[in-house]
Amino acid sequence: MPRRPSGGGGGAGPAAAAVRKVPLRKLLRAASVACGVQFGWALQLSLLTPYVQELGIPHAFASLVWLCGPLSGLLVQPLVGHLSDRIAPAASPLGRRRPFIAAGAASIAAAVLTVGFSADLGRIFGDSITPGSTRLGAIIVYLVGFWLLDVGNNATQGPCRAFLADLTENDPRRTRIANAYFSLFMALGNILGYATGAYSGWYKIFPFTVTPSCSISCANLKSAFLLDIIILVVTTCITVASVQEPQSLGSDEADHPSTEQEAFLWELFGSFRYFTLPVWMVLIVTALTWIGWFPFILFDTDWMGREIYRGSPDDPSITQSYHDGVRMGSFGLMLNSVLLGFTSIVLEKLCRKWGAGLVWGVSNILMALCFVAMLVITYVAKNMDYPPSGVPPTGIVIASLVVFTILGAPLAITYSIPYAMAASRVENLGLGQGLAMGILNLAIVIPQVIVSLGSGPWDQLFGGGNAPAFAVAAAASFIGGLVAILGLPRARIASRRRGHR
C-alpha cells in the first residue's frame, strides 16, 4: 500500500543520487531487448491470425485465440511486476528486474519454437495433411505455444519498463526519453519483423523447414521464428549486461520488508482507492486507446488479404490471393514501423512543446480518422470491378499502405506516453514501478478481452467482414482523444529537481 516518503539522511542523499545518474547511452542499451521481443511480436501480429485460419479455425473464432494474450497479461504482468518490486536489489546477482527479463525471453524462445513447429507436432498426434482439413492436434499445440508466447511477452516487457523507470529515478524528462528509446527499439524490431514476414523465400534459406505437414507458407513462418530466436538472444544479453541496477531504492521501498506477505491481488486492486483523478484519466484514456488498437492488431493483414485482395485461407482457389494480401499487409506494417521509429525520435520535443496530454489526444483522433479511412477503402474496394487477374487496383493498394503507414505515429505515442505518465504519477503514491506497470497493463488487457470476445460476433452479425470491429475502433479512439485533450494536463512537463524522493 502507499507509504509516506521519509527524509532519510546520510551520504546517499539527493546529491549522491544525482552523481549516480545513469548515462543515456546505457539507457539506450537497457532498452534494446524491446527489439528482440517486438521482432517476434511483429511476426505474431502479421502472420499468426492468417496461419491459425489455415489450421482450421474459422475467421469468426480467430479473435478468440487472442484471448490468450490479455488473459495471461491480466495476471502475469502485474504479478511479475509485484514480485520484482519485492526482491531486494542485492539479493540477486542480476538485481530485481533482469532475472525476469531473462526468464521471459527464454519463455518467448520456447513459445515460438512450439508455434513454428505446431503443424509438424500435430502430424505426430495424428493430424491429416489433406488440404482444407482441420488439424486439431496442430491447433492444440499452437494454442499452448501462443499462450506461452504471450506469457513471455508480458513477463519481459513489464519488468523492462520498470527497469527503465528505476534507472531514471522517475525524473519525468529522463523517463520519457527512456520510454522513447524503448519505442525506438520496438520500431526497429517491428521493421525487421514485418520485413521478415513480407519475404516469401525464407524456406529456401532453411530448406529443412519444408515438410509434408508444413507447406511453403508454413515453412516461411517457421524460418522467421528461428531468426527471431537469434535476435532475441542477442538483444536480451545486451540489456542484461547494460548497466547495474540501482542498489539504493529510496526510503519508500527500502523500508518495505522483504518478508512481508501481503496478498498480491489485494494490493493490486486495493491500490485503486489511492488513485488521484490524473491517474484515473491516464487509465481511462489507455483503455479507450487499446479498444481502438486491438481490432487493427488482430485483423490488419487479414483485412488486406480478404477485403483488398479478395482472398480467403479457406478456399484453395483464392488462397494465393489471400497470402499475397497478407504479405502486402506485412509490408504496410513495416512502413508503419518506419514512421513509428521517426516519431519516437521527435516525441520528447513534441511533449515539451505541446504537453503529453495534448499530443496523446491528437494522436488518438488521428487513429480514428485512419480507421474511418479503412472503412471507406473497404466500401470502395467492395464495389469496384477488379481485373481478371484478381490483382486489386494500384490506387486501392496505395491508399491502404498510406493508412497503415500513418498509423505508425499514434502507435509510437501509445507505446511511450502512457507508460511515462503512469511512472511519473504513481511516485507520490508510494507504489513500486513494477506494480505501477502492472496496473497500467490492466487498462490494456481488459479492453483486449472485450474486443476478442466481441469482434467475432460483430463481424458475423454484419456480414462476416472486419468492418464492424474497425467501426468500434474508430469510435473508441475518437472518444479517447477527446478525453485526453480535455482531461489530461496540456502544460509542458518540466524536469523536476532531484532534491527529494
Swiss-Prot record:
Q: Which residues lie on this side of the membrane: Cytoplasmic?
A: 1-31, 77-98, 157-176, 244-278, 349-356, 416-433, 489-501
Q: Where are the transmembrane segments?
A: 32-52, 56-76, 99-119, 136-156, 177-197, 223-243, 279-299, 328-348, 357-377, 395-415, 434-454, 468-488
Q: What UniProt keywords apply to this chain's record, in alphabetical order?
A: Cell membrane, Membrane, Sugar transport, Symport, Transmembrane, Transmembrane helix, Transport
Output the Pfam families linked to this UniProt entry. Answer: MFS_1
Q: Which GO terms of type biological process are on file?
A: sucrose metabolic process
Q: What membrane topology was assigned to this protein in its record?
A: Multi-pass membrane protein
Query: Does the keyword Membrane feature in the UniProt annotation?
Result: yes
Biological or metabolic pathway of the protein: Glycan biosynthesis; sucrose metabolism
Query: What is the documented function of this protein?
Result: Responsible for the transport of sucrose into the cell, with the concomitant uptake of protons (symport system). May also transport other glucosides.
Q: How does it assemble?
A: Homodimer.
> Can you tell me which family this protein belongs to?
Belongs to the glycoside-pentoside-hexuronide (GPH) cation symporter transporter (TC 2.A.2.4) family.
Protein's UniProt name? Sucrose transport protein SUT2
Query: What species was this sequence derived from?
Result: Oryza sativa subsp. indica (Rice)
